[in-house]
Amino acid sequence: DERYGRFRNWCEQQAESYAKEVKGDYIQETVQVTDTWINISDKGGYQYPHHHANSYLSAIYYVNFDMARDHVPTYFTRDTNFINAPALNVITGKTTEYNQNNEVLSNEGELVIFPSQLNHGYDENTGYNRISLSMNFMPTIVTNGDYGWRCVNLNQSERKKAFDEKEGLPNN
């Protein structure tokens, strides 16, 4: 669908801008959406805190909710032992403005982008029909200037082969 293509391109542009301008990361080319999914939360629905593995950035696009009645904020938590590469084994425990819990109360039509390893979720929904679209991003090329790797989408047979090899299953 052409509308989804335009929306996807816009999301990728926003994620690339976030990576370069907010995170300060050196992204040689662009970022790409690797997967998307819809979240529908009726009254009483909630999302346990979680992070997204095997991903660089994640985003939530808020599609539908009644801001005055139904919306609960998305919260983000960053423990004092937050893993960051390279991982350093240091004693931590001090809460600062950078590792405290934060909440984001977004409006319909807003896109929130964040590092995928950041825990996030939301408490019990008080209304009906809270709909959001979530997605993950990866850079098309990851490099330090001397070496790197290219992130590509695998077709169905490539995914099956990679899974079978990982699980030690015979290739059929």
Sequence positions of predicted segments:
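Residue-level signal for beta-strand positions within conserved beta-sheet cores that form or flank
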Residues: 34, 70-72, 129
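Residue-level detector of short, conserved catalytic/binding motifs and their immediate flanks
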Residues: 36, 57, 131
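Signature of the catalytic double-stranded beta-helix
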Residues: 1-45, 49-52
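An acidic/histidine-cluster motif and surrounding catalytic segment
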Residues: 136
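Short, cationic low-complexity segments
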Residues: 81-88, 153-172
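Ligand-binding loop in jelly-roll beta-barrel domains
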Residues: 119-132
